UniProtKB/Swiss-Prot annotation:
This is Large ribosomal subunit protein bL27. HAMAP family: Ribosomal_bL27. One of its GO terms (biological process) is translation. The gene is rpmA. It comes from the Bacteria. It comes from Borrelia duttonii (strain Ly).
Amino acid sequence: MATSKSGGSSKNGRDSISKRLGVKRSGGQFVRAGEIIIRQRGTKFHKGKNSGLGRDHTIFALKDGIVEFKTSKGRKYINII
């Protein structure tokens, strides 16, 4: 017979993989058309001039230019100028 009781199972030991969200190109940086500027969950940042919004709320450049972050009426916009 076993001389020690069986150990209890732990409910820890899990971790999800990181999603690599965040700002990929800073303000004042040059971007080419199609480059990702921000990966986000929801619209923390909104698309502005010459930038597009993907179905996962990714903001990307529609034209070559300089990234500009702008705040208007409590919303943060991303423009390509």
